[in-house]
Amino acid sequence: MDEASCRFPEWVSSKIIDYYAEQNIKALFDWQIDVLNEARQFEDQHLIFSAPTSAGKSIVAELLSWKVASTGRKVLFVLPYISVAREKLHQIQRCWRRDDISVCGFIGPQASNPNEWLGAVCTIEKAASLTNRALSEDWFEEIGMIVVDEMHMVFDSSRGAHIEHMLSKVLLWNQSALEKVRIIGMSATIPELYRIGKWLDGAKVFEARFRPIVLQNHIVIGSELRKSGDNKVLREFSEDPLILLTEESFRRNSQTLVMISSKLDAEKTALNIASRFHEINKTDSSLLEILKERANGLLFIKHGLERNGCKDRNVMSTLAWGVAYHHAGLTMEERECIELGFREKNIVILVATSTLASGVNLPAERVLIKAQPRGPSALTSLNYRQMVGRAGRTGHATRGETYLLIKKCDRDAVLKIIETPIDQGVLTRKRDAERTNLSRFILEGICTGLTTTRSQIHDLCKLLLFNSENLQLSDIAIEMLLRNSFISQDENDDQLSPTQLGRAAIASSLPPEASLAIFEDLNSASRAIALDTELHMLYLVTPINVSVWQECDWHHLFSIFSKLPSDHKRIAKLVGVSEKFILDQLQGRRNDKLLQIHIRFFSALALFDLISEMSIYEVSHKYRIPRGCLQTLQSQSATYAAMIVAFCLRLGWTYLKALLDGFATRLLFGVRSELSELVAIEGIDGQRARILHERGVTCLSHLSACDSSKLAHFLTLAVPYSSSNSNDGLGEWLFGEPRMRVDVAARTLKERARKVLIRRVQELGISVELPKFEENEENIQESCDSGLPDSCEGMEDELEEKENIVKMEEMTKSVTEMSLTDNTISFKSEDDLFKKEIKVEEDEVFIKKEIDEDEEEIVEETVIECLETSLLKLKASTDEVFLRRLSQTFSPIGRSRSILNNSLLEDSFDRPVPRSSIPILNFITPKRESPTPYFEDSFDRPIPGSLPISSSRRKSVLTNIANLDSSRRESINSNASDNNSFDVFVTPPTKSAKEEKRRIAVKHPRVGNIIYSPLTSSPVIKHPKLEINHFYLKDVCHDHNAWNLWTKSSTSTSSCSIRVSDDYTGIAIRTDAGNTFIPLLETFGGEPSPASKYFESFSKCIIPLNTRLEFLKTLAVTVEMYISSMEDAFLIFEKFGIKIFRLKVVRIAAYLNNVIDVEQEENSNFLPILMDRYSILDPEIRKTCSSSLHKAAVEVYSLKPIFEKMCCSGASLQLEMESCQTVLNIFYSGIVFDQALCNSFIYKIRKQIENLEENIWRLAYGKFNIHSSNEVANVLFYRLGLIYPETSGCKPKLRHLPTNKLILEQMNTQHPIVGKILEYRQIQHTLTQCLMPLAKFIGRIHCWFEMCTSTGRILTSVPNLQNVPKRISSDGMSARQLFIANSENLLIGADYKQLELRVLAHLSNDSNLVNLITSDRDLFEELSIQWNFPRDAVKQLCYGLIYGMGAKSLSELTRMSIEDAEKMLKAFFAMFPGVRSYINETKEKVCKEEPISTIIGRRTIIKASGIGEERARIERVAVNYTIQGSASEIFKTAIVDIESKIKEFGAQIVLTIHDEVLVECPEIHVAAASESIENCMQNALSHLLRVPMRVSMKTGRSWADLK
């Protein structure tokens, strides 16, 4: 290297320098340093620089752009070709992500939100479109730099206009912008370099001559070899110089590129070279020796081509000799295989068309150029320099040689071309209409708002590079745009504005002239479109000017046309295709006007076969189109389809847009429409989509409105059972995504569908913004009070207005047909037990509340009340809840479901339990005509949806209810304060005199079954009670006297309740001194809500924040504290530093009493449900809540009463409350976390991931998205042709084959890439799901815990430490090394040995199993010897049994045959018959709906609903409940005892994971503390157990070092 190298500038980040060092770039050249220094010195100027190929231009632009991106401004990289853009995207992403700078690609159909990236890599057209978008959407000022690679493309006759127009708009923007956009342009061959610099506002121009490897250029004229620029003949060839030069290259093992002008010539040349090598091999075996070195690589390439369906004999025959050809006639997959083979140096000679020189980065030591001075691909000066630049690239070759082969007759013409300066070559080249036609450029300027007058347009045109050519044409272009209604002009002034057609043209990236043709095409089609097949719609999205048919074989096309079905021929006639024209073509008669229509139709036929999932090779053979050209047609049509859809959308052609929407994706991927909408949602593959489709979830609206529990159930049907799912509650429920809970997966899918759905609806102009409910809360109240029809009037108008735009039925799954003429409203319950007809006036649509309250009916009152409550809750709900409740609130009249039975009441009442155990309390309503509503003897039949007293409460039951006379009815209200509570679900009484007169009547009493308490074994019967509410919220922080009085009174209280407000501004608290709200902000300006009879108006807080906090901290230590859930306790500590030491958790109590189901999404906000159930507060109070302050106060009021109503004495409740306090103390303690080591791990893992990526791509013969399961499946099963496991349970013919861990582990021996993908996924998962979330923690991690789980086990949640891996990679890194003890302390790890198995032994009382466990021998080892199976397989069986594993699952997990797995199962149950008996007994209880219980008596009833797999799953849940539940009770007892015993040693529990406890203890007390911990764990509930517990004790400095 003849130029000294220098280190990087000091302003470059060390992370970026490290990246380049890994790429073997450890220093910069002098010229690069000079450019960087000048660029930094003149930051306000644009920069244009030129340097030879391989001199290092890209790194200069990358460093400058990185500097801009690091300041938060966006950078655009503009590259000419998709292949080089993809390569640049991956490289920039790998580099910049080290500095946490996001980079995305605008290359294919994908797009990205501008808020999600700082760097964008674009093709030329995408960059032009992106800048238009930025200007239109007013975020252009966020762009700081535009880097144009291959700047010479600005002179290109077809695409250069895009660059010129884009940069001209930037120049105009910069004239008035405060923060300018900087332009960086570079290329090895920039014509008129200084002219470009002058054009770009006097940009700094830099031209370097340095090239690391000096080229040796040669010219071969005829058979004579000369050095370029020298007439001396160096050598004369006796045969074809090209063949001899390639043979010479092959013998010296030197890779060679041969550049040919045409595809046909490239194939012919490659075949000639291969034939030559074959002939030589007959007499000289030296070539064969060279090939032997590459035999494996060439064989691998051959297999790769075959797996991609390549049947081209020419490709295979040339490949056998290390020769290949590369042109656009090959498919993309074939080209990628060949490119990879050349990069890996397995292919020695590559013959390619000249487009490869600029489109693909494939350097070589020697480049041969076969000159063609004439024809469509004639050699140019610029093209020549691009091709010779491929020789001698740094890092790929040690020398560079070029040979230009010229026929003697073409000598003068070719020499003239290569000796012509590129500047002159550009100036003499003819420019096409795209360059001179300014209509598109001017229209873009007007649509983006850059120009609004003719003078501004002239100013913009002056900024063009070729302004002298264009200025005179600008007025002509403006007139054309005006004439064709693309723009309009104000009559009073010169203002120009875009029309709808103009905006549509720009939005769809269509030139104005093309827009007119497309407008006419679509307009005529919309009047007569055939919908019996997709062919006509596909024809409309097929490009008008199709150029993939090189030469049409009309004989063959006529044969195809004559065999078309009748519906296709009808469409052909509709679009203008005729048999007569084809016959005319056969006879040589031309008609150019109709030619394009016919070519377009046959192209549509080919595309129709492609989206019907016919292979590209079959379609290519059927229509005789080169497969590469067919792929080009497919890609162009996908792009064109997206443009057409955007065009229709902008024009407001909603129906046509709806018909054509989706074709872009289908054309791109070649799929049928059946599942396209569901598969478009991330996380859904073909298997999941088919299950959802079969269950009625056929579109996004169904998915978003589907009940979460149902959706979770569907996922369990779609995903094969795995034993790991039951251990921690996690599974691979979403395709290609990390393991998660099934309910989380269901909610995730709903959320994704909801977002897409709402975005689509909003795009149609229909507002679904929730704040409107919040802003008009009073109006909602009033409309609910006066009747719902008034509140819906506006909505009906809006729907009527939008009738011609969109169908709302599919969006909401609710707004369906409404009959406004029926004068009868019919209510039906689900089981159709009761019916009630209520007469209403003809103009009424919904149930109304009568003005005369004396004649109100309880059913109306209840419904209206529920509607009001639902609407009030609606304003604070998510959009998802909005969609669901909109559907349920405005249900159509006359449906088969009752309003009382739909989900309006789901927010107020628990999920019903089996009807067999539910006593029903029926509300009876007098006829509307009755003048005596309270004492009428004649009553209608009970209304449906009678409100049940749920047996899930397990507390009270209603027995022998007889008809009550008026006095008895009055006594119910008068006894509302009686201590003998009698729970009746009626509307709570209010202070209104009229409301006091209301009565209830009960008819046809039913006697309910006696229900046993979950905490005791005796039946519980209580009397109903209506609690009188005394609620008032007062402000004690506005005055010192009020504060002192309240604190003094509260200090003497024995208990209190607290609740964090939703906006975290403070805490609502209830003590004996009353209800109040304590703001915990430094400044609190008061609550603007007006005072009412329930809420005092809050004014500015004058009590110091420290005073407020100190009192609350003191109170939390001294009194018993009732809280809603553990999350509240965690929040109170994190937000305000308040610790609670005497805990009562309402959610735990509700769960123990089976009032809520922890698996149900609806129970996440359970307090309103419980408040309604136990009549804690008048709903009127909750309805008047106008802020989060009020809501918190209302909820805190209910905590203690709810807890006391639910709780009976019992060991289970006591244990849960004690363990909750212990877990809370663990949260307070936290565990020490080594953040520095974590960051070090992240850095190392990212390097490993990059290396793995390169290895995987190399093994796959091309790059692909490793994160995409679809692309992984495509590579494994199609590109590489691996065999899908037969035991996977999935049909190999499905489009999207699963590639989960289980499948890949079964395929691991087929190919090395499988193991690499598994390793990549494991490391990537550790990085993204473990290390990166943990990296933000400093000091100690205070982990949240989930106590309310279906099995009772304790789970970690925020952050989730449940699955911190023991080992990250093979070099010994472990994530558990990050969790350490403080200095002078050690960690003690105590882990139960076979806890679940020991519990099973106790519960089953199987003597053999009890004896084995009691003997303290290695159970698994002994069983392994007895059964002659591996120990690991035996262990899997024993634990799998607990989780309900069958023979098939066991065989998949242990990789044994199903027969062997069945033998193991039979051997296990034969040896331990008591286990089988216990499992059968538990299943029998489920069938009889009898309670099942844990060791200390926690009971529940699980109903065996469903058949087949669903029933088996429920039975497994029941068995799991008893075993896991009992295990959790042992573990909770142990940690409670441990906490009390280790205090004397100064030790504390810092973490619990599964059955393991981590204790941090001073090193001097480790031995004593370990002994105490072991005793506590071994003796936990030992008096109830038949088998002993055994514990593994370990100590160490970190979690990973425990020994």
UniProtKB/Swiss-Prot annotation:
Coiled-coil ranges (or none): none
| GO annotation, cellular component aspect | nucleus
Where in or outside the cell is it found? Nucleus
Looking up SUPFAM superfamilies in the UniProt record yields: DNA/RNA polymerases, P-loop containing nucleoside triphosphate hydrolases, Sec63 N-terminal domain-like
Q: What happens when the gene is disrupted?
A: RNAi-mediated knockdown results in defective DNA damage-induced checkpoint activation as indicated by an increased number of apoptotic corpses and enlarged nuclei in the mitotic zone of the germline in response to DNA interstrand cross-linking agents such as nitrogen mustard.
Molecular function in Gene Ontology: ATP binding; DNA binding; DNA-directed DNA polymerase activity
What family is reported? Belongs to the DNA polymerase type-A family.
Query: What name is this protein filed under?
Result: DNA polymerase theta
Taxonomic lineage of this organism? Eukaryota, Metazoa, Ecdysozoa, Nematoda, Chromadorea
Give me the gene this protein comes from: polq-1
